[in-house]
From Swiss-Prot:
<dbReference type="GO" id="GO:0005634">
    <property type="term" value="C:nucleus"/>
</dbReference>
<feature type="compositionally biased region" description="Acidic residues">
    <location>
        <begin position="11"/>
        <end position="28"/>
    </location>
</feature>
<feature type="compositionally biased region" description="Basic and acidic residues">
    <location>
        <begin position="1"/>
        <end position="10"/>
    </location>
</feature>
<keyword id="KW-0597">Phosphoprotein</keyword>
<dbReference type="Pfam" id="PF00956">
    <property type="entry name" value="NAP"/>
</dbReference>
<dbReference type="GO" id="GO:0042393">
    <property type="term" value="F:histone binding"/>
</dbReference>
<feature type="region of interest" description="Disordered">
    <location>
        <begin position="346"/>
        <end position="391"/>
    </location>
</feature>
<dbReference type="GO" id="GO:0003723">
    <property type="term" value="F:RNA binding"/>
</dbReference>
<keyword id="KW-0449">Lipoprotein</keyword>
<feature type="short sequence motif" description="Nuclear localization signal">
    <location>
        <begin position="273"/>
        <end position="279"/>
    </location>
</feature>
<feature type="modified residue" description="Phosphoserine">
    <location>
        <position position="69"/>
    </location>
</feature>
<dbReference type="GO" id="GO:0003682">
    <property type="term" value="F:chromatin binding"/>
</dbReference>
<dbReference type="GO" id="GO:2000179">
    <property type="term" value="P:positive regulation of neural precursor cell proliferation"/>
</dbReference>
<dbReference type="GO" id="GO:0050769">
    <property type="term" value="P:positive regulation of neurogenesis"/>
</dbReference>
<feature type="region of interest" description="Disordered">
    <location>
        <begin position="132"/>
        <end position="163"/>
    </location>
</feature>
<keyword id="KW-0488">Methylation</keyword>
<feature type="modified residue" description="Phosphoserine">
    <location>
        <position position="143"/>
    </location>
</feature>
Length: 391
């Protein structure tokens, strides 16, 4: 038995010697090839990958990994850079305050144009032929003869129809053309919004805390007695002491609506529902009437109140976040460019912006696909652990 074991050991030793001889004869290229194959096998092992990722996380993905390993003297210099960054944020805050002052200054220059817009929409002023002259891009190649023919046909159509005053349903059309606003407008809101004459933005006075007010001007109507509905947005342009590096320009801190004086039976923000209740003992049935909230654009003027603690439930936070977005959109886009949202041209421009971003993303995807087809491509080399974590 011992002889058999010795024989097997001798054969094993001989095999190892043969392997060593073969390895010595292998070229450098073969050694590299085997190393590459071994690397591929390791990268396909989930346990090895997990261990490697954990180590990378400790070094790079968590800030403390690399930063904590720095010498103390280097950490001191990093702290100095942080203090410089705080000062940069403070300067940036002053920059935005001056931008707000410029907006207030130029609002005065814009106002005569917006006043003329208001007068045309509401049939107070009839623009002259010269003011109405407009040459769309598609008319560049149209002959004078065709233009004259089209003009005559338009005049005939105008004669057949009754003469409308101003631009009917201007603001309602704007709202319905913009997804962000049309989602808020219910069918029962539309008859009321037909009475909307104008939307204005007013900025806070110099030296006052940053804020702006949206004014919705209505003509007399059968729904409420208010001539103007307002929404005030309070803003802040200063870094938060507890987190100065998060500063990214002015932010809306809160908003206040107004009371709508609804006429009797015309409040579209409420609805009455009837429920039948059956008595368990006697079996009798009674009808109970209850008033509950109703979806409406006019809920925009009754935002959730923020308690002194600042704590809000998830629903209230979502409503306020959407409210702030809408207020900013009305101020920055709708009011200054309303005619382009009425015609739909601004919406097409917005869509083009999104399309360009989508095309860039598609091109990046194609490039990534080409890399994945490369047998020597290692996706781990291209990944930035910090970016992956943020996603």
């Amino acid at each position: 038995m011992a002889d058999i074991d010795n024989k097997e050991q001798s054969e094993l030793d001989q095999d190892l010697d043969d392997v060593e001889e073969v390895e010595e004869e292998e070229t450098g290229e073969e050694t590299k090839l085997k190393a590459r194959q071994l690397t591929v096998q390791m990268m396909q092992n989930p346990q090895i990958l997990a261990a490697l990722q954990e180590r990378l996380d400790g070094l790079v993905e968590t800030p403390t990994g690399y930063i904590e390993s720095l010498p103390r003297v280097v950490k001191r210099r990093v702290n100095a850079l942080k203090n410089l960054q705080v000062k940069c944020a403070q300067i940036e805050a002053k920059f935005y305050e001056e931008v707000h002052d410029l907006e207030r200054k130029y609002a005065v220059l814009y106002q005569p144009l917006f006043d003329k817009r208001f007068e045309i929409i509401n049939a107070i002023y009839e623009p002259t032929e010269e003011e109405c002259e407009w040459k769309p891009d598609e008319e560049d190649e149209i002959s004078e003869e065709l233009k004259e023919k089209a003009k005559i046909e338009d005049e005939k159509k105008d004669e057949e129809k009754e003469d409308p005053k101003g631009i009917p349903e201007f603001w309602l059309t704007v709202f319905k053309n913009v997804d962000l606003l049309s989602d808020m407008v219910q069918e029962h809101d539309e008859p009321i919004l037909k009475h909307l004459k104008d939307i204005k933005v007013k900025f806070s006075d110099a030296g006052q805390p940053m804020s702006f007010v949206l004014e919705f001007h209505f003509e007399p109507n059968e729904y409420f007695t208010n001539e103007v509905l307002t929404k005030t947005y309070r803003m802040r342009s200063e870094p938060d002491d507890s987190d100065p590096f998060s500063f990214d320009g002015p932010e809306i801190m809160g908003c206040t609506g107004c009371q709508i004086d609804w006429k009797k039976g015309k409040n579209v923000t409420l609805k009455t529902i009837k429920k039948k209740q059956k008595h368990k003992g006697r079996g009798t049935v009674r009808t109970v009437t209850k008033t509950v909230s109703n979806d409406s654009f006019f809920n925009f003027f009754a935002p959730p109140e923020v308690p002194e603690s600042g704590d809000l439930d998830d629903d209230a936070e979502a409503i306020l976040a959407a409210d702030f977005e809408i207020g900013h959109f009305l101020r920055e886009r709708i009011i200054p460019r309303s005619v382009l949202y009425f015609t739909g041209e601004a919406i097409e421009d917005d869509d083009d912006d999104y399309d360009e971003e989508g095309e860039e993303a598609d091109e990046e995807g194609e490039e990534e696909g080409d890399e994945e087809n490369d047998p020597d491509y290692d996706p781990k080399k291209d990944q930035n652990p910090a970016e992956c974590k943020q996603q």
